[in-house]
């Protein structure tokens, strides 16, 4: 076979003409060490703080420590298959999670992946987990209420839309119960809810989801679960992921409520990650930025004005304000509210609901200590009816607690003191409320009116709860018009007082309790 030089040169020319040299610029490095969910990488020159890093086998991580010679990263998920020498690539993206209406009714992990076996989620979009909180000019003052359905909360420590109200107490004092009742009560209020479970037992999370389903509350709720079996990085990120999901509704002129259960465990997870990354420890071995950890999260809960909503939606939504209300939970050790994390979160939030073990064990549930609990901005958001009647209730409880301390030592009490003590006992009984039984504004208002106007004074202390239950049954059957009127316009005036007085007196004359 004879070779033709011209054919060969022609073939080479054709190949050269058709050759496409594609140069791909890629920023990649090599794993130096890996263990405990932490990874050190050499060679990632242009990594950003909080950037997503791509590891082999579809595993992702997040850059947290940017040092001169290496990058410290947390691995999100399983890391057993990673080893020294593996290649790591920069993605050029900050960590994002899916957001939107399609997440309602679902249980997801800290990265927004479904964990409830109901199939994939077709999200409307995605949002960065870390966002800057709205500025002062973008905000609007808190003046609309979030009704929790709990008498003790709505009357004494009211919560407004866009507020941050801390729920603090020892373990087993009913902190989660207060938050879950608040979520259940939003069924017809239009408020979307996000429940973030951090570092809890998987069985506890399953039980909460079951209760929400049972009371038809799961349809308006997103559950973000980072159980105790998940890595510290996932527990640290879960709160920010839930917040991003809540901001989606806030920025569209809607109202959302987010529960962080609980931020103590998130601080523990962040402490673990920081110590493994060899950051210098401070008080209680927490890193120096543990205050910023919680402040940047809770400052994102806010009420934003209509101009800001219009700007964020490119003019699609006009004349509507949006809000994200936060209920962070903190667990104290033996009632010590002066520990590092509790004092931090108390100073960041707009008030706290303090739950006490002694009250809980004595059967007063929710176990709210009215003296130590406070709401700094919620008063301006209360309905007129509850605001007027709730003031008298709070005063009666405060006087009762003060006098009860003296009454232990005094043998003979004057008539006025004895009356105040007796009324205080009845108000304490009235504040008791079983779990999963939220009350409407009208039911709450009439119950508080009965106590405030002295209709409970001749009822035996152990019959107060029965009296209230019978009163509400009577109102639902005989005075439905009054309940509907108070629910639609909860004002406080002479006409309303007259109607409530007539209804309560009619019930008392029937003696059906």
From Swiss-Prot:
ATP binds at residues 169-176. Its EC number is 7.1.2.2. It is a peripheral membrane protein. GO terms for cellular component: plasma membrane; proton-transporting ATP synthase complex. It is an enzyme of class 7 (translocase). One of its GO terms (molecular function) is proton-transporting ATP synthase activity, rotational mechanism. It catalyses: ATP + H2O + 4 H(+)(in) = ADP + phosphate + 5 H(+)(out). The record marks 373 as: Required for activity. CDD domains: ATP-synt_F1_alpha_C, ATP-synt_F1_alpha_N, F1-ATPase_alpha_CD. Keywords: ATP synthesis, ATP-binding, Cell inner membrane, Cell membrane, CF(1), Hydrogen ion transport, Ion transport, Membrane, Nucleotide-binding, Translocase, Transport. It is found in: Cell inner membrane. F-type ATPases have 2 components, CF(1) - the catalytic core - and CF(0) - the membrane proton channel. CF(1) has five subunits: alpha(3), beta(3), gamma(1), delta(1), epsilon(1). CF(0) has three main subunits: a(1), b(2) and c(9-12). The alpha and beta chains form an alternating ring which encloses part of the gamma chain. CF(1) is attached to CF(0) by a central stalk formed by the gamma and epsilon chains, while a peripheral stalk is formed by the delta and b chains. Produces ATP from ADP in the presence of a proton gradient across the membrane. The alpha chain is a regulatory subunit. NCBIfam families: atpA, PRK13343.1. This is ATP synthase subunit alpha. The gene is atpA.
